Amino acid sequence: MKINLERLCRRLNYHFNNMAYLKQALTHCSAGSDNYERFEFLGDSILSFVIANELFNRFPLHSEGQLSRLRSFLVKGEMLAEIAREIGLGDYLFLGQGELRSGGFRRTSILADALEAILAAIYLDGGMTAAKQIILMLYSSRLDDPDLNHCLKDAKTQLQEFLQASKFALPEYVLTKVEGDEHAQIFHVTCTIEGVSQVAYGTGPNRRKAEQLAAKAMLEQLQG
């Protein structure tokens, strides 16, 4: 099947002077030695810088920790794959037969890596200004989202606010088990809410982490 790279360029709103950059950025390691692995390395750093710079300018009152959490939220693999799916990136990937058969064009990790590689390809082809422009275009709806700062709140806080807004009782966290050696303990926590049938569980290296994971699991259940 012939892949129409010009169509992808239109979706990216960027025309490559050297289409070889784009083709390499779309080539998985299973499809050849001239693949996107090195591009991915470069694209990861470019994306991180552009998003960090944008957040720094948009949120002058945020602390370093808050800016770091926002950046981590925006550049995580799941977010990259989500953006990749929005532009139909999976349809343009060059994959080996094994990856094709196993549905690699839908895999979150492959989509995320390929998107980072494309950002590197744009940088190599058109410079930092072009790369920044495309990154901010792809991220515009997320950067402008009034709920973006919700990711700064931990899971227990988000769950409590959700329950209060929905007129539910507050959650109860119960430590049900601690296992393992003293220097490598595993804590098990159960989260329940009076009047709610769902039960959520969290496991972590300390009680706080286990409670946070249980709260996250409960919130995901309640929000469907």
From Swiss-Prot:
PROSITE patterns: DS_RBD, RNASE_3_1, RNASE_3_2. Its main location: cytoplasm. The active site is at residues 44, 116. Mg(2+) binds at residues 40, 113, 116. Its EC number is 3.1.26.3. InterPro entries: dsRBD_dom, RNase_III, RNase_III_dom, RNase_III_sf. Digests double-stranded RNA. Involved in the processing of primary rRNA transcript to yield the immediate precursors to the large and small rRNAs (23S and 16S). Processes some mRNAs, and tRNAs when they are encoded in the rRNA operon. Processes pre-crRNA and tracrRNA of type II CRISPR loci if present in the organism. Homodimer. This is Ribonuclease 3. It comes from Legionella pneumophila (strain Lens).
